[in-house]
Curated annotation (Swiss-Prot):
Keyword Translocase in record: no
Membrane topology: Lipid-anchor
Protein name: Flagellar L-ring protein
Compartment(s): Cell outer membrane; Bacterial flagellum basal body
Family the UniProt entry places it in: Belongs to the FlgH family.
GO biological process: bacterial-type flagellum-dependent cell motility
Swiss-Prot/TrEMBL keywords: Bacterial flagellum, Cell outer membrane, Lipoprotein, Membrane, Palmitate, Signal
Protein function: Assembles around the rod to form the L-ring and probably protects the motor/basal body from shearing forces during rotation.
Name of the gene: flgH
A Gene Ontology term for the protein's cellular component: bacterial-type flagellum basal body, distal rod, L ring
Matches recorded under InterPro entries: Flag_Lring
Length: 216
């Protein structure tokens, strides 16, 4: 058992990922060729629709502001019940001329039962609120736009990376050239943190060992 304990420590220590500090290089979002239907008008530019207001994003490369307000509340529960029981009885009826009354007391019997019950519950909740500046990377023939925003922050070895993309209608952009996340279709949000603060929230190596030895 002692050898198994040290073997698990060695395996877990070898599996620990050591992060190397890499120089971050910004990559511009990929842009697509605009595909717009021909409008039979002298004012073909979409900006002409807002002659008395502020300029709103409408073409590839335009900047748009995205206000993210998302709440997460997930609850998952699992329960299992397993049971089994067996019983048997047998009596010896004849054995080399021994009297039947004597053999009746030589019967064999047994009973066994097994029951197992387990359950688990997972709950996660959180609120994500931020404002990002993104770009229009594609304009579809119906006027909707594919927008993408990314933000990368590194302070004292703690890294935060945020990526958002989705489809926006021009009508949902307000006069401040801002759209809220609840009006973005097919929205994808990627948020990841790396560093010693993030690792501090992870279980330690000893807790991982006990989780392997006692999974239930």
């Amino acid at each position: 058992m002692l050898y198994l304990f040290f073997a698990l420590i060695f395996i877990i220590s070898c599996s620990t990922k050591v992060e190397s500090k890499k120089k971050y290089t910004y990559s511009f979002p990929k842009t697509y060729k605009e595909e717009k239907p021909t409008r039979g008008s002298l004012f073909k530019s979409p900006q002409s629709a807002y002659l008395y207001g502020s300029v709103r994003a409408s073409e590839v490369g335009d900047v748009i502001y995205i206000r993210v307000i998302e709440s997460i509340n997930a609850i998952e529960s699992v329960s299992t019940n397993v049971g089994r029981s067996t019983s048997f009885s047998n009596a010896i009826s004849s054995f080399f001329g021994v009297h039947p009354a004597t053999l009746k007391n030589l019967g064999a019997g047994g009973k066994s039962s097994f029951a197992s019950k387990g359950g688990s519950k997972f709950q996660q909740s959180g609120v994500l609120t931020t404002t990002l500046a993104g770009r229009v990377v594609k304009v579809f023939p119906n006027g909707t736009m594919l927008v993408e925003a990314k933000k990368y922050i590194e302070v004292n070895g703690v890294k935060r990376e945020f990526l958002l993309r989705g489809i926006v209608r021009p009508e949902d952009i307000d006069s401040n050239n801002t759209v809220t996340s609840d009006k973005i279709a097919d929205m994808e949000i990627f948020f990841e943190g790396r560093g010693y603060i993030v690792r501090g929230g992870e279980p330690g190596w000893l807790a991982k060992i006990f989780a392997i030895l006692f999974p239930f």
